[in-house]
């Protein structure tokens, strides 16, 4: 056993030693790799917190850092891979290469370490295009060969064909060693020696303006004597205007740096992909054009405001018109589109820049050398992107400050106020567009991360796939906790979309639909959101189809409040299922896309027609000016013809009437108001002139007189000026014709747009219209036989379609007939029931009349002191149907007994319950009315009066409320003094 233990112990020791040696080798290898990186000989040193890293320009907070004694560079340990090659090692390699060729090329001057680096012109500017642009393309190997030939001439002078071949080979090798170096070295030298020159060339258009705006404010830019002539309010206003122009100039400079320095260098010098560069600098060309045009307008206004004989002193009194022009109309729409695109991609651009800077050494050194120049100080890529993003937010502040100091001129104040409103509206629209674009990008990101096969069943609708997400807009999204039926919480990603709520889970870095006990897609139709009373972060989602209740919890109380608010807003704006189905099939999606494209094409066609009208008006106006009508104003273009959103745009009848009215006006101008145009089926014949016997504007041979390709309008004595009775200058016939002609042209094109829109609408509504396709095939066929063949080919299909339509109509008519028959039967049954009810009511009426007659006889007998029968006929009176329907008084009504006459008394006694209730009333009534005999003697018509009085006294209460009050009163069994009860009598 001791031997086995010793062998085991020895084996363990050997494994430990081997592991220790392996770790030491790995450490030595890592140290060696760390020491020799890109030619640097790094050593580990201890530094203080104030030492800056050469690679990332950040302080070195770690205790240990790396330093290269060759080039004296101190960096982080993690930044060693991003550092460029060691410059000293490069210089040694270059010097060794030159020394090897020194025996064959004595004219080559060596570079020393202490002297300034000098390179041949071809090495600095390797191509002709780069002489014009600092960062031009090298054009591959052809540029290298060109650089090689030029450098050969520069180094060795002029050699003829008789020069030794070996010498030419040595020259070739030496020039190759100069030109085929690392590309990064070329970039360094190019940028070091040409950034300032190229920047000056770039800003040459605004060189004088930059000098004029070098001062910090207008008060410092103008002369002191000129400054003292103005009030304090004027000085403040001019300072703000000066700041506006100065910052606009700086903004244009920033855009030019982005476009002409950074972007051009990345494309041509670094040979980066255009898509990558476009991702870094989106829409910079459009932004540069917009702000350059605005800056030129501001500078022109400044030049107009200069004092005579001075290039510095100026006072700008009017600026509101320029601001309104810049922030309204097409300019505002262009700014909205470009800034929305740029600001929405701002985050992606910065992320892409950081990724490129971290992984690409050439890109890193390019940026570092570019920003090292004095002219590009504080103008790196990140700073430029941020400055462009923030520029549009500066306009409201500047215009508001100008407005506060412009109380003198009312018109200028109104213009500035309008401009301020336009700028705020533009900024709000840009914010909204940026928010929508960010939501679209986020939705696309979620869509890309979802499993392509992910689906979830929707009860009664079918499977809901990830393609359904792209049909909708993302309104809000966030991570929530879903409480399951078992009481456990699940992390879910909740998407609030146009008409649904979608629950997603993350699995293997992909999103899938939640597979829990409830559907993961909830419709917003009739959705109810309620917060949980005892929980600050929880809320209930109660859906109606299918009826389910979800309990979810947000991260905080504010987050829950935000969710409740946006969900309630979305529920109110949720579209109906007829307009927006929950799940769309492929056919419906295809039709929807086709309809969307059709609408876009219609819009493009309408815009082309509108542009056509504008060009026609411009052409006619130019011809009129060329004909000698110098003072003629440009004609007014017809507005509202091509606006698809207006209700009047689709009124073709109105357009036709307007066009006919314009034609009538032209006829009156050309032929006179008393001449009527005969309307024929083919060609309208013009009436003959009474003097010449020919048509106006028509020669003897029937040809129209033309001038410069247009019909010559007849005018009377055009040379002499025409005036009215008041001496006012009259408009010539050409001027009178010009505006109606423009109106007619615009109306006809508007009518064409209406026809196109209506045809597209009919195609969308009735895709199977055979007659229309037949007409179109006839109209579009160039050959008659081909047209007839097309019609013949469509005939069977037409017949089949017509047969199907007739069958469908027959089926619909049969269904309508059956429905009418059922309706007639129902009406007959209802009429029979009404007749039965009428007969019953007549029988009840006859019975009531007989009872009333019997009561009259009894009352007459009562008046003669005749005793009533024990059972009066009206005691057997059936219950009134209306009384049966009373819910609370049925029992009381059934227990009601009519009064019985008591012998020996001159009054009627009521039952106990009713007497006790109406006792005060009975006493008062007895005193007023007296005995029945007195009433019979005083009454002229005993039947009529007694019946009404007795019925009013003896009838039961008229409403359920009276019965309720009667039931609430306890029954009294005591009778009055000297009055026997009903039972005793």
From Swiss-Prot:
Phosphorylation of Ser-885 by PAK1 induces binding to protein YWHAZ, promoting its relocation to microtubules and the inhibition of its activity. Phosphorylated by AURKA and CDK1 during mitosis, which negatively regulates its activity. Phosphorylation by MAPK1 or MAPK3 increases nucleotide exchange activity. Phosphorylation by PAK4 releases GEF-H1 from the microtubules. Phosphorylated on serine, threonine and tyrosine residues in a RIPK2-dependent manner. Ubiquitous, with the exception of liver tissue. Levels are high in hemopoietic tissues (thymus, spleen, bone marrow) as well as in kidney and lung. Expressed in the germinal zones of both the neocortex and the cerebellum and in the pontine gray nuclei. One of its GO terms (biological process) is establishment of mitotic spindle orientation. A zinc finger (Phorbol-ester/DAG-type) spans 39-86. The modification Phosphotyrosine is found at residue 893. The modification N6-acetyllysine is found at residue 354. The modification Phosphoserine is found at residues 109, 122, 129, 133, 137, 143, 151, 163, 172, 174, 177, 646, 649, 692, 710, 781, 885, 895, 931, 939-940, 946, 951-952, 955, 959. Residues 591-619, 797-866 form a coiled coil. Residues 473-572 form the PH domain. SMART domains: C1, PH, RhoGEF. Residues 236-433 form the DH domain. Keywords: Acetylation, Cell cycle, Cell division, Cell junction, Coiled coil, Cytoplasm, Cytoplasmic vesicle, Cytoskeleton, Developmental protein, Differentiation, Golgi apparatus, Guanine-nucleotide releasing factor, Immunity, Innate immunity, Metal-binding, Microtubule, Mitosis, Neurogenesis, Phosphoprotein, Proto-oncogene, Tight junction, Zinc, Zinc-finger. GO terms for molecular function: guanyl-nucleotide exchange factor activity; microtubule binding; small GTPase binding; zinc ion binding. The keyword Ribosomal protein does not apply. The modification Phosphothreonine is found at residues 680, 795, 944. Residues 940-949 have a biased composition (Acidic residues). Residues 131-161 are annotated as: Interaction with DYNLT1. It is found in: Cytoplasm, Cytoskeleton; Cytoplasm; Cell junction, Tight junction; Golgi apparatus. Disruption phenotype: Mice show reduced volume of the total brain, the cerebellum and the brainstem. Show complete lack of precerebellar pontin gray and reticulotegmental nuclei. Show impaired precerebellar neuron migration. GO terms for cellular component: bicellular tight junction; cytoplasm; cytoplasmic vesicle; cytoskeleton; dendritic shaft; Golgi apparatus; microtubule; neuronal cell body. Residues 919-938 have a biased composition (Basic and acidic residues). Activates Rho-GTPases by promoting the exchange of GDP for GTP. May be involved in epithelial barrier permeability, cell motility and polarization, dendritic spine morphology, antigen presentation, leukemic cell differentiation, cell cycle regulation, innate immune response, and cancer. Binds Rac-GTPases, but does not seem to promote nucleotide exchange activity toward Rac-GTPases. May stimulate instead the cortical activity of Rac. Inactive toward CDC42, TC10, or Ras-GTPases. Found in a complex composed at least of ARHGEF2, NOD2 and RIPK2. Interacts with RIPK2; the interaction mediates tyrosine phosphorylation of RIPK2 by Src kinase CSK. Interacts with RIPK1 and RIPK3. Interacts with YWHAZ/14-3-3 zeta; when phosphorylated at Ser-885. Interacts with the kinases PAK4, AURKA and MAPK1. Interacts with RHOA and RAC1. Interacts with NOD1. Interacts (via the N- terminal zinc finger) with CAPN6 (via domain II). Interacts with DYNLT1. This is Rho guanine nucleotide exchange factor 2. It comes from Mus musculus. The lineage of its organism: Eukaryota, Metazoa, Chordata, Craniata, Vertebrata.
């Amino acid at each position: 056993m001791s031997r086995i233990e010793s062998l085991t112990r020895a084996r363990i020791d050997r494994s430990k030693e081997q592991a220790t040696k392996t770790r030491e080798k790995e450490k030595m290898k890592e140290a060696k790799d760390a020491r020799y990186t890109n030619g640097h000989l790094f050593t580990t040193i201890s530094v203080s917190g104030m030492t800056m890293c050469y690679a990332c320009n950040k302080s070195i907070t770690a205790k240990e850092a790396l330093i290269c004694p060759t080039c004296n560079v101190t960096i982080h340990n993690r930044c060693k891979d991003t550092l460029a090659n060691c410059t000293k090692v490069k210089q040694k390699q270059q010097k060794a290469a030159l020394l090897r060729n020194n025996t064959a090329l004595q004219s080559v001057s060596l570079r020393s370490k202490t002297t300034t680096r000098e390179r041949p012109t071809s090495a600095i500017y390797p191509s002709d295009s780069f002489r014009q642009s600092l960062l031009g393309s090298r054009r591959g190997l052809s540029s290298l060969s060109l650089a090689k030939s030029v450098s050969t001439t520069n180094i060795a002078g002029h050699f003829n064909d008789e020069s030794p071949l070996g010498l030419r080979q040595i020259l070739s090798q030496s020039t190759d060693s100069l030109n085929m170096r690392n590309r990064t070295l070329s970039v360094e030298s190019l940028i070091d020696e040409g950034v300032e020159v190229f920047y000056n060339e770039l800003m040459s258009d605004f060189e004088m303006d930059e000098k004029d705006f070098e001062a910090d404010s207008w008060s410092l830019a103008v002369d002191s004597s000129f400054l003292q002539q103005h009030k304090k309010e004027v000085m403040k206003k001019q300072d703000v205007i000066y700041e506006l122009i100065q910052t606009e100039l700086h903004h244009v400079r920033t855009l030019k740096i982005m476009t002409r320095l950074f972007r051009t260098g990345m494309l041509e010098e670094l040979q980066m992909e255009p898509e990558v560069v476009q991702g870094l600098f989106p829409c910079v060309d459009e932004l540069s054009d917009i702000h350059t045009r605005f800056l030129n307008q501001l500078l022109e206004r400044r030049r107009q405001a200069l004092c005579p004989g001075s290039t510095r002193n100026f006072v700008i009194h009017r600026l509101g018109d320029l601001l309104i022009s810049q922030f309204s109309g097409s300019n505002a729409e262009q700014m909205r589109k470009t800034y929305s695109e740029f600001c929405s991609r701002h985050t992606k651009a910065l992320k892409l820049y950081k990724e490129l800077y971290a992984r690409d050494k050439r890109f890193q050194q390019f940026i570092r050398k570019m920003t090292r120049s004095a002219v590009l100080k504080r103008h790196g890529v990140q700073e430029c992107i941020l400055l462009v993003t923030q520029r549009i937010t500066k306009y409201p502040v500047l215009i508001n400050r100008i407005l506060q100091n412009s109380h003198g001129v009312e018109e200028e104040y109104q213009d500035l106020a309008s401009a301020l409103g336009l700028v705020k509206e533009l900024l709000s629209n840009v914010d909204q567009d940026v928010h929508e674009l960010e939501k679209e990008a986020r939705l696309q990101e979620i869509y890309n991360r979802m499993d392509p096969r992910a689906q979830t069943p929707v009860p009664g609708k079918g499977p809901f796939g990830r393609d359904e997400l792209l049909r909708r807009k993302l309104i809000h999204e966030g991570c929530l906790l879903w409480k399951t039926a078992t009481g456990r919480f699940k992390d879910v990603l909740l998407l609030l979309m146009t008409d649904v709520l979608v629950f997603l889970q993350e699995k293997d870095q992909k999103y899938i639909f939640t597979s829990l006990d409830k559907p993961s897609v909830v419709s917003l139709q009739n959705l109810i959101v309620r917060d949980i009373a005892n929980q600050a972060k929880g809320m209930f989602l109660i859906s109606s189809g299918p009826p389910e209740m979800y309990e979810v919890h947000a991260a905080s109380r504010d987050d829950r409040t935000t969710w409740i608010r946006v969900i309630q807003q979305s529920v109110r704006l949720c579209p109906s299922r007829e307009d927006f189905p929950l799940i769309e099939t492929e056919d419906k999606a295809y039709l929807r896309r086709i309809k969307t494209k059709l609408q876009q094409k219609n819009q493009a066609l309408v815009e082309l027609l509108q542009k056509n009208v504008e060009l026609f008006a411009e052409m006619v106006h130019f011809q009129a000016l060329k004909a000698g009508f110098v003072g003629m104003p440009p004609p007014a273009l017809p507005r509202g013809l091509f606006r698809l959103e207006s209700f009047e745009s689709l009124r073709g009848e109105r357009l036709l009437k307007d066009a006919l009215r314009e034609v009538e006006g032209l006829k009156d101008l050309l032929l006179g108001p008393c001449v009527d145009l005969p309307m024929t089926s083919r060609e309208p014949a013009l009436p003959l002139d009474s003097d010449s016997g020919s048509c106006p504007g028509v020669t003897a041979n029937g040809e129209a007189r033309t001038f410069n390709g247009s019909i010559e309008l007849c005018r009377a004595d055009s040379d002499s000026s025409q005036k009215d009775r008041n001496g006012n200058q009259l408009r010539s016939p050409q001027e009178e014709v010009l505006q109606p002609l423009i109106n007619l042209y615009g109306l006809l094109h508007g009518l064409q747009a209406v026809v196109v829109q209506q045809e597209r609408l009919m195609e969308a509504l009735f895709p199977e219209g055979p007659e229309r396709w037949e007409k179109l095939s006839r109209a579009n066929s160039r050959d008659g036989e081909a047209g007839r063949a097309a019609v013949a080919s469509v005939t069977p299909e037409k017949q089949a379609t017509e047969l199907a339509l007739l069958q469908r109509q027959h089926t619909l008519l049969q269904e309508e007939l059956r429905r009418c028959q059922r309706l007639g039967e129902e009406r007959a049954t209802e009429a029979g029931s009404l007749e039965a009810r009428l007969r019953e009511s007549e029988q009840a009426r006859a019975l009531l009349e007989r009872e009333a007659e019997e009561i009259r006889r009894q009352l007459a007998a009562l008046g003669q002191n005749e005793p009533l029968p024990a059972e009066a006929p009206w005691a057997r009176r059936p219950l009134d149907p209306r009384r049966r329907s009373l819910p609370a008084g049925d029992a009381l009504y059934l227990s009601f007994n009519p009064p019985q006459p008591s012998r020996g008394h001159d009054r009627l006694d009521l039952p106990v319950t009713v007497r006790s209730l109406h006792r005060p009333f009975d006493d008062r009534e007895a005193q007023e009315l007296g005995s029945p005999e007195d009433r019979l003697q005083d009454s002229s018509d005993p039947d009529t009066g007694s019946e009404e009085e007795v019925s009013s006294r003896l009838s039961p209460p008229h409403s359920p409320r009276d019965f309720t009050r009667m039931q609430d009163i306890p029954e009294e069994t005591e009778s009055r003094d000297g009055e026997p009860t009903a039972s005793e009598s």
